[in-house]
Amino acid sequence: MAQNENQIGVLGAGLIGMSWAGLFSAFGYDTTIYDPYLKKQHVARNEISNIWASLDLLFDNLQNKKEVKFSDKLDDLKGASFIQENCPEDFFLKQELISKIERIVSQDTIIASSTSSFMPSELQNGCANPERIIVGHPMNPPHLIPVVEIVLG
């Protein structure tokens, strides 16, 4: 399965997921947000615009912005080289989503969770390639505070 080094998948369109997506897309990454409840895309697009406006105040030359794509199909993340998971802090939900996305993306794709509650070893349990599942827990909001706690399994 081919992956695109410039393609990022974001799981979850909540506050943290939107912040990540706005940051990635502002710096030119092809970013797709997966959320099964994408009923309010216009609200999400407005939030991305607000994030970009904040970043424009911090950086002089953000000229490579890419439109964020929204999807309710995990398969739309197939070519991503990096996945940032941001679903609610429900262990079984996170584990199920990580297990599903792991079967869709390349074996080399890094899957990071924004969790503040679970260890990577817990999220890796039952995964085919557990070494690529990490915690990438941001300080909030990630588009404004450039600090990410990275925890390996």
Regions found by a protein language model. Give the residues of each.
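Rossmann-like NAD(P)-binding element
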Residues: P36-K39, S54-I110, F118-M119
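NAD(P)+-binding Rossmann beta1-loop-alpha1 motif at the extreme N-terminus of oxidoreductases
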Residues: M1-I51, K69
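Hydrophobic packing residues within well-ordered alpha-helices of enzyme cores
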Residues: A44, I101, L123-Q124
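Rossmann-fold dinucleotide-binding core
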Residues: I110-G153
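Short, flexible turn/loop "capping" segments at secondary-structure junctions
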Residues: S25-A26, L77, P141-I145
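Hydrophobic/aromatic beta-strand patches that form the interior of the parallel beta-sheet core
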Residues: T32-Y34, Q84, I134
